[in-house]
Amino acid sequence: MSQHALSSSFFASKPTTSSPKRRPASSSRRVASRDNRVRAGLFEDILDSVLPKPMSDARKQMEYFDGPGGMLAKINPLAKKPTMKAPEVSAGKSSQVLFDFTSMSQDEFKSEFGALNDNVMGGRSDALTVLESGKCAVLKGMTEDQFGGFASMKSRDFDRAINLQEFDGVSVRCKGDGQRYKLILYDTDDSFNVAFHQTFECPRGNFEDVKLYFKDFKPVQRGRLVLQNESEYRLCDGSKVLAVQLMLSKFSYGMDDKNTNYKPGAFDIEVERIEAFKD
């Protein structure tokens, strides 16, 4: 075979190469986002392994409600706060279910409700909230009578505020240890702003509907009852509800108002349903 033929044969058999295909920008962003989440998860695991349990729990609780960075997410204009889908409110009904824990799935519950305890402010209470499938939501644990002295379960903010003004109040179908709990309604996404508190005695034995009228909720801001002559004072009429919280606290309506039906230690409350009602 001639040299030319050998040369032609060599070049003919040499595989051709093409420039590597570029990954679409959207795909690259997804991969980068996934990698960032993995790195963030590893960092959080390391952080939790060295933090005392109360501080680790506080970090997780703040991130559940405020997003990555916890409280720092509040000052980040690009941070997206986790929310949940608001219930559809139908006009003309005698009641409006907000949360039915008897029919809620575990995934729904985990994406909508979380524990929020006094360890976010240096306390030592240790409580959790769980869903007993087909039965109820349970808030249980231990409270300590130092620092904050509270434990709670709270919903994530609704993705839009709901108007319950045509109703008379909110009822909590519950049972438990007989202590004095309180329901808190939020009308803003700022936890340092005014929120509306109302205390109630938790029934023992069987589930009962505890009715809490909007007119009886009191405005509280940062652990202090807001007085009528103050600029922050406003009443609760149910026209704007953004989140709901159920709490056991050593205080009733502010830090100068002790809860006389509270004792530190073990506690539990079971909740079947939270709904708006008309008399």
Predicted regions and their residues:
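N-terminal chloroplast transit peptides
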Residues: 1-29, 40
